[in-house]
Amino acid sequence: MNHVNQSLVDLLMEEHSGQRSELIAMLAFEKPEVCEELVRLTFSNEEPLSRRAAWPLRKLYDHHPEKMIPYIDYFVLQLQDVKSESVLRTILSILSRCTIPEEYHGMMLEFCESKMLNANTSIASVANCIDIYYAIASGEPDLLRELDLMFEILRPTASAGIKSKMGIIHRKMKKTTSERGY
């Protein structure tokens, strides 16, 4: 284990707080090797280390989204292998706020659909998947219809938060389709 890795692991495991995550995010901003190691640890599926590494990544994205851009392809490609719902929720939160490269649209649509329709997926992950799906589908009437059909499936058992998210997206969909004449 190299020095950067051990020091970062120690920082992550000593204390789990918002303040500690902000500190680690600041270190990752200043030192690319720390950022790279955070990404590696996040996707290592070593609990609780993976969860604790993911949180500073989200903080880094919140303050400096440009630092995460080089990792977006990697995030997308690693999603299927994430075992922790907490890590998944964090990565989906980041992906829901950035532009997914077009070459991964099909993969992300399938992934998000499976997560949205899986009753075991956390509410936050479902909400992020709805945002991602809509962002990709927004220019495609057939995909918007599929999203609307998924909403019909979800509605009977959806939480209040998911119903609210679906309502917001449904209004955007109606506006988009009426503006474009679909």
Segments predicted by a language model, with ranges:
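Alpha-helical scaffold domains
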Residues: 1-182
